[in-house]
Each structure stands twice: as C-alpha cells, then as structure tokens.
UniProtKB/Swiss-Prot annotation:
InterPro entries: Natr_peptide, Natr_peptide_CS, Natriuretic_peptide_brain
Swiss-Prot/TrEMBL GO biological process terms: regulation of blood pressure; vasodilation
Purpose: Snake venom natriuretic peptide that has a vasorelaxant activity in rat aortic strips and a diuretic potency in anesthetized rats. May act by activating natriuretic receptors (NPR1 and/or NPR2).
Pfam family, one: ANP
Organism of derivation: Crotalus atrox
GO (cellular component) term, any one: extracellular region
SMART domains (UniProt xref): NAT_PEP
Tissue and organ expression note: Venom gland.
Protein name as annotated: C-type natriuretic peptide
Amino acid sequence: AKKRAGNGCFGLKLDRIGSMSGLGC
C-alpha cells in the first residue's frame, strides 16, 4: 500500500501509514 492507491488519491498524506492509503482510492 505504498504506491498502490497513494498514486494520485488523497492517500498521499496517509501513504506513510499504508493502512489508509488503500482507503484513499
């Protein structure tokens, strides 16, 4: 979940957590 959904979604800020990064998309 590093650059999975945090590519262009709001998960960029939550990309560090990696958990909410997927929920971003």
